[in-house]
């Protein structure tokens, strides 16, 4: 039996943060994929584990089936419980520990929410709303500008090393091309475009460093297979 069960979705970025951490820490897991079109994530069995009815939800079978949801909370749990060598995290007494937590909150409230809304209005909304697409694309650029400033004199967000703070940004940034692509609608009006490398070179270089990690490559290979199968 795998150490963890991860309730997931083949396309949603947030569960794949958890996969990244599990792979970085060499922890075994089984993924159960829900079909959002059928509303499977709202089934009674899943709501009993996660009353919010969203993914990811993680069950730790080696800790009395301890269950936790919210992707960045899961990252903290995995780091505190299983990253004893602090490969991708920091110890509680490290002066940068709360900076790490800070960036996880920034990812959740700054990147995740905005990228998600941009995706909704680009791919799923029932009608084109140019003002919404413009707003969220501009907000993406604002957040990338914040990261650009943070990374102007460092390679990673915290303590000059790769941590779950960096990891948390990877899956949503992986979708940047699609968020600025044509999507569901063709707009007659001009909407913001993005040249990531040219406009935000420090953030782009950071993202490329993250994508080069073996665990990240393996995660996106698994993601591609999951999309084919689900």
Curated annotation (Swiss-Prot):
Per the record, what are the reactions this protein catalyses?
Answer: RX + glutathione = an S-substituted glutathione + a halide anion + H(+)
Record-annotated GST C-terminal domain positions: 93-230
Q: Where is the GST N-terminal domain?
A: 2-86
GO molecular function terms attached to this record: glutathione transferase activity
Could you give a single Gene Ontology term from the biological process aspect? cellular detoxification
Taxonomically, the superkingdom here is Eukaryota
Per the record, its GO cellular-component terms are: cytoplasm; cytosol; nucleus
The UniProt record lists the keyword Ribonucleoprotein: no
Cross-referenced InterPro entries, in alphabetical order?
Answer: Glutathione-S-Trfase_C-like, Glutathione-S-Trfase_C_sf, Glutathione_S-Trfase_N, GST_C, Thioredoxin-like_sf
Q: What is its EC number?
A: 2.5.1.18
Cite the Pfam families for this sequence. GST_C, GST_N
UniProtKB keywords: Transferase
Query: What positions belong to coiled-coil segments?
Result: none
CDD domains in the record: GST_C_Ure2p (cd10293), GST_N_Ure2p_like (cd03048)
Q: What induces it?
A: By O-dinitrobenzene.
What functional role does this protein have?
Involved in the oxidative stress response and detoxification.
Q: Which family does it belong to?
A: Belongs to the GST superfamily.
Q: What is this protein called?
A: Glutathione S-transferase 2
Protein's gene: gst2
């Amino acid at each position: 039996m795998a150490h963890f069960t991860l309730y997931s979705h083949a396309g949603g970025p947030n569960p794949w943060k958890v996969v990244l951490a599990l792979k970085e820490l060499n922890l075994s897991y089984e993924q159960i994929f829900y079909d959002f079109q059928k509303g499977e994530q709202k089934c009674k069995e899943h709501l009993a584990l996660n009353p919010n009815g969203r993914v990811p939800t993680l069950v730790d079978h080696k800790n009395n089936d301890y269950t936790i949801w919210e992707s960045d909370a899961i990252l903290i749990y995995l780091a505190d419980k299983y990253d004893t060598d602090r490969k991708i995290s920091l110890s509680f007494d490290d002066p940068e520990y709360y900076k790490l937590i800070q960036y996880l909150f920034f990812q959740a409230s700054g990147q995740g929410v905005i990228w998600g809304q941009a995706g909704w209005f680009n791919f799923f909304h029932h009608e084109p709303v140019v003002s919404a697409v413009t707003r969220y694309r501009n907000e993406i650029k604002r957040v990338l500008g914040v990261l650009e400033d943070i990374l102007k004199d460092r390679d990673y967000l915290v303590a000059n090393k790769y941590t779950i703070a960096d990891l948390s940004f990877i899956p949503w940034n992986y979708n940047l091309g699609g968020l600025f692509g044509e999507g569901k609608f063709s707009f007659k009006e001009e909407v913001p475009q993005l040249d990531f490398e040219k406009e935000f070179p420090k953030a782009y270089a950071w993202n490329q460093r993250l994508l080069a990690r073996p665990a990240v490559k393996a995660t996106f290979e698994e993601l591609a297979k999951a999309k084919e199968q689900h």
